[in-house]
Design a protein with these regions (language model features):
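C-terminal catalytic/substrate-binding lobe primarily of soluble NAD(P)-dependent oxidoreductases
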Residues: 1-199
Length: 199
């Protein structure tokens, strides 16, 4: 089972990865760049480079940024199951005929998998979501790691969901609150990184 929308999660993981470097997009085969990283509060994990929509907005809104990459961790069991599903065609996104009707295999699979919201009471452990920044400050190379650690069970007690939904929903709720209060207010459609972070 996935801890977020299964269709979106499986599409992200099985799709080619990409990252922004030197003013253009670089595409790589799915899951082809893997790093081992020691995450604060979580420990050593394998992380894989994926394409994610956040990096599109960051590349567009941070002038002169040299490189932006997005990594996500996955256990070997998850990856093995995903590869089996891919091998038998269950991650296909094109319609196929089945018993006289058209179905999209990945959408059918989503209907069979548990609703991620139902997994909150039994999800244990912690998440670590962060950004590693490297660059030059005052003529010297500098590296900064900003991160957030959330405990699945603490999140569930607070809002009735596991930490993945919590860390997705809370920033969106804060942004909505800032718009409702008029602190973030300009005509058009914008991503959060285009607004004042300290209203």
């Amino acid at each position: 089972a996935t801890n977020f929308n299964p269709e979106i999660n499986l599409r992200e993981v099985s799709a080619p990865g990409s990252y922004w470097e030197d003013g253009h997009w670089v595409e790589i085969p799915a899951m082809s760049i893997k790093r081992e990283y020691n995450f604060e509060g979580v420990g050593m994990k394998d992380m894989y480079l994926l394409h994610h929509e956040e990096i599109e907005a960051l590349a567009a809104n941070i002038p002169h940024v040299k490189r932006i990459r997005f990594f996500m961790t996955f256990g070997q069991s998850y990856l093995t199951h995903m590869k089996c599903l891919e091998n038998v065609g269950m991650l296909r996104t094109d319609p196929v005929e089945f018993n006289g009707q058209e179905i999209v295999p990945i959408q059918f699979l989503k209907a069979l998998l548990p609703d991620p919201a139902s997994l909150g009471p039994r999800t244990v452990g912690k998440t670590n979501i962060g950004c590693i920044f490297t660059g030059i400050k005052d003529g010297k190379e500098k590296k900064v790691y900003i991160y957030n650690v959330c405990d699945h069970q603490e999140c569930y007690r607070e809002v009735g969901s596991q930490a993945i939904s919590y860390t997705t929903g809370v920033p969106a709720m804060i942004g909505t609150m800032l718009v409702a209060k008029g602190l973030w207010n300009k005509p058009g459609v914008f991503t959060t990184d285009e607004f004042d972070p300290d209203p």
